[in-house]
Swiss-Prot record:
Transmembrane segments annotated in the record for this chain: none
Main function: Acts as a ribosome collision sensor. Detects stalled/collided disomes (pairs of ribosomes where the leading ribosome is stalled and a second ribosome has collided with it) and endonucleolytically cleaves mRNA at the 5' boundary of the stalled ribosome. Stalled/collided disomes form a new interface (primarily via the 30S subunits) that binds SmrB. Cleaved mRNA becomes available for tmRNA ligation, leading to ribosomal subunit dissociation and rescue of stalled ribosomes.
Keyword Membrane in record: no
Protein name: Ribosome rescue factor SmrB
Regulation of protein activity: Correct positioning in stalled/collided ribosomes is probably required for activation.
Presence of keyword Nuclease: yes
Listed EC numbers: 3.1.-.-
Species per Swiss-Prot/TrEMBL record: Escherichia coli (strain K12)
Comment, domains: Has a probably flexible N-terminal domain and a conserved C-terminal SMR domain; the N-terminal domain is required for ribosome binding via uS2.
Family: Belongs to the SmrB family.
Domain of life: Bacteria
Amino acid sequence: MKKKTTLSEEDQALFRQLMAGTRKIKQDTIVHRPQRKKISEVPVKRLIQEQADASHYFSDEFQPLLNTEGPVKYVRPDVSHFEAKKLRRGDYSPELFLDLHGLTQLQAKQELGALIAACRREHVFCACVMHGHGKHILKQQTPLWLAQHPHVMAFHQAPKEYGGDAALLVLIEVEEWLPPELP
């Protein structure tokens, strides 16, 4: 451990003289986010329940009408179409990534449900879902499942840096977070 260096009396007096007439600045420009809970702090039973609740929305029988021409995209009716444009341009950078490679459809649904629940719990607005190319099963099903979930605001085929046509950028509706009151 290093020794603490102390200032001489002369240096301390000089410092006090230079600082005379100054006042402490009140910090009011940075709003601190609440610390995120680690996933390990959330009870396992709650995680399993959230995952089951979220995957409840994914049906294989219901086929939402999605545009089949061009890149895969979807915007919920109450959300601005500019959000899809922002996703396409890469204005949103995903904070959570989900890789569905090698999963069955059932496992993929459960993982999608867990991702959406985690995004809402952690206040994450944008996530990336990598479905891959493979046999095109997950590539075709993933957009259909996401379009059914009420907390998915929009999704768009990811830009090249996030996986291109083998991935989707997803906007998740999170509960409104208000900054803490400043004293």
